[in-house]
Structure formats: C-alpha cells, structure tokens
C-alpha cells in the first residue's frame, strides 16, 4: 500500500514538472517564432534554471517570474558596475559607468512598474515598461561606442538584453 501511495505521489510530482517544462518550452518556441531576436535556447535554459519559472503553471505566471529574473539581473549588474567604479583600472571610464548605473536605475523602475502592470493585467502598460527597460543595455553600450571606449560590461549587457526580451515577448502573447 505504501508503495502505491509513493508511486502516485511520484507520478503527480513528475507530471507537475513535465507541465512546467512543457509550458516553458512551448512559450519560448512561440515567442521565438514571433521575435527572432529571442534566443530559444537562452530562453529555455534561463527559465528552467529559475525556481519560480519552473513552478509556473500559466503564461502570466511565467511573465511574472521572468520579469523578476530580469530585475534580479539588473540588481546584479548594478553591483558589478559599483565595483568597477572603485577599480583603478576603470578610472578613465568612470563617467560612462555612472551613466550606465543611472540607466540601470531607470530600468529597475521600469521593471517594477511592469510587474505592477502584469499583476493588474495591464499588459499594454507592461509592454511599454518592458520595452523601456529593454533599451537600457543598448543605451549603455552606445555611450561607450560614442566615446570610443571599451565597455567592461558588454557581456553582462548582452545577457541583460536577452533576459528582458523574454518577458517582453511573453507579454506580447497575452
């Protein structure tokens, strides 16, 4: 009898995991079909590594989880830039880094507003705020290019762009 109960519980757990995995894969596939800028592999990999995304049962909950992930990436990147500002190797690009830090603060505000939009089912508002946040990594990199300087955070900005693109693409599917 205990074996049967254990088997039923295991199969329910496995089914729940499979459902979340299917939601992630299907959502990433549909989003990629609509927006080729989105990397299908990056989408699936980043969402399957996130516990909130893995627990999502609807596209809306996946949008919330992926937006929170993007906000966490910005917070992490702000920490990296704060460390770079203290590093003597980057003293010739302090102003550029400060400008990027300001951009990240704006993006953080945009994502906070987008989360509120999503929770209230204002997907158009969420789209506007996610789009504004999506511009930030490029704006930061553009500043370095215009100044003919090398950005020490190009890779991080690329990852941030891809990360923000996920909830934006999903919001367009709601």
Swiss-Prot record:
Family: Belongs to the PMEI family.
Taxonomic placement: Eukaryota, Viridiplantae, Streptophyta, Embryophyta, Tracheophyta
Domain of life from the UniProt record: Eukaryota
Keyword Secreted annotated: yes
Organism from which the protein derives: Arabidopsis thaliana
The keyword Disulfide bond is annotated on this UniProt entry: yes
GO biological process: embryo development ending in seed dormancy; plant-type cell wall organization or biogenesis
Gene from which this protein is expressed: PMEI12
Residues that carry a glycan: 129
Name of this protein: Pectinesterase inhibitor 12
Keywords: Apoplast, Disulfide bond, Glycoprotein, Secreted, Signal
Induction: Induced in leaves during infection by Botrytis cinerea.
Function as written in the Swiss-Prot or TrEMBL entry: Pectin methylesterase (PME) inhibitor involved in the maintenance of cell wall integrity in response to necrotrophic pathogens. Modulates PME activity and pectin methylesterification during infection by Botrytis cinerea and contributes to resistance against the pathogen.
InterPro entries, per database record: Invertase/methylesterase_inhib, Pectinesterase_inhib_dom, Pla_a_1-like
Main location: secreted
GO cellular component: apoplast
Disulfide pattern: 28-43, 100-140
